[in-house]
């Protein structure tokens, strides 16, 4: 329908065995429909043959979301509490590009977004598709950084690397650029911000509540991947305590659910360690 939000909500177990079943053909079909202004979001159900990778792929191609519904509570969250954000976009093709000042930052690492990476030249190319943001929702990008001159650097400095020249950028840690399109627009809008000491929290405790909780969630994700990149002492308990300290009002109980997930994951991790070769009896 013209001048309306057109979105297909696909409920599936991810086993596409009727109609288009070839992954590449399916992705191409979704991409063509996206160009006509039709969004696609995927809600996954079932166990056993559940195909999460395929669902994530076509949802990204269709500028939508992919969620797994395993409980009545999750269904209520997706189809009631978060419905507006899951259906109505407020920004299309949102791109973030961060340039770190080598005079202040020796190393950096983006946590997550492995399937959303763009080439540097794609940032200014409005023809390159990117993610969308729904009404009432927000997106957080977390970078792990090592200050210049720190003993914690994991790699040696570049022999021929050129440090940033002193001047107007001396007090900057990074320069953030954000591009987005208004829904239906062909050209993007650019927003920039220089990150300085004014943006820095002096300690973890003084950081905003949302930032502390987001860090706990990122740490949880890293632990699920093995935790090899996490520092000593930042394990399940530290992640849980960080989340507890930033739980806030938690109107719908989502943060409390996350904290409970850390307990369940810690228990499962301990059980797996006992049954692994060379562990336990």
Please tell me what each predicted stretch does.
Residues 10-12, 42-44, 98-100, 143-147, ...:
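Flexible glycine-/small-residue-rich
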Residues 5, 30, 34, 54, ...:
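Amphipathic, alpha-helical segments enriched in basic
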Residues 1, 9, 61-65, 98, ...:
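A broadly tuned preference for mixed-charge, low-complexity surface segments
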Residues 39, 61-138, 144:
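Polar, glycine-rich mid-to-C-terminal structural blocks
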Residues 105, 113-139, 145-281:
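Long, acidic serine/threonine- and proline-rich intrinsically disordered regions
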Residues 1-94, 153-166, 249, 259-272, ...:
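Exposed acidic/Ser/Thr-rich ligand/metal-binding surfaces
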Residues 13-17, 47, 73, 101-103, ...:
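Short, glycine-/Ser/Thr-/acidic-enriched flexible segments
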């Amino acid at each position: 329908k013209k001048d309306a939000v057109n979105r297909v909500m696909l409920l599936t177990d991810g086993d596409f065995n009727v109609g288009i079943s070839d992954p590449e053909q399916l992705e191409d079909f979704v991409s063509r429909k996206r160009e006509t202004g039709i969004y696609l979001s995927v809600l996954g159900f079932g166990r056993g043959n559940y195909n999460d990778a395929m669902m994530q792929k076509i949802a990204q191609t269709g500028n939508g979301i992919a969620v797994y519904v395993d409980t009545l509570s999750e269904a209520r969250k997706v189809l009631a509490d978060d419905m507006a954000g899951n259906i109505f976009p407020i920004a299309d093709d949102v791109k973030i590009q961060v340039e770190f000042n080598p005079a202040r930052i020796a190393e950096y690492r983006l946590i997550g977004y492995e399937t959303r990476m763009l080439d540097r030249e794609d940032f200014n190319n409005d023809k390159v598709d990117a993610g969308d943001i729904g009404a009432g929702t927000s997106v957080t990008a977390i970078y792990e950084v090592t200050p210049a001159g720190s003993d914690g650097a994991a790699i040696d400095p570049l022999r021929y690397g050129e440090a940033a020249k002193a001047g107007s950028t001396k007090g900057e840690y990074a320069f953030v650029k954000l591009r987005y399109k208004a829904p239906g627009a062909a050209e993007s809008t650019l927003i920039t911000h220089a990150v300085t000491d004014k943006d820095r929290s002096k300690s973890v405790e003084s950081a905003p509540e949302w930032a502390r909780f987001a860090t706990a969630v990122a740490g949880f994700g890293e632990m699920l991947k093995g935790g090899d990149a996490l520092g000593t002492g930042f394990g399940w308990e530290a992640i849980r305590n960080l989340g507890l300290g930033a739980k806030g009002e938690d109107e719908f109980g989502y943060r409390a659910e996350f904290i409970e997930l850390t307990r369940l994951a810690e228990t499962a991790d301990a059980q797996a360690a006992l049954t692994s070769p060379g562990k336990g009896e």
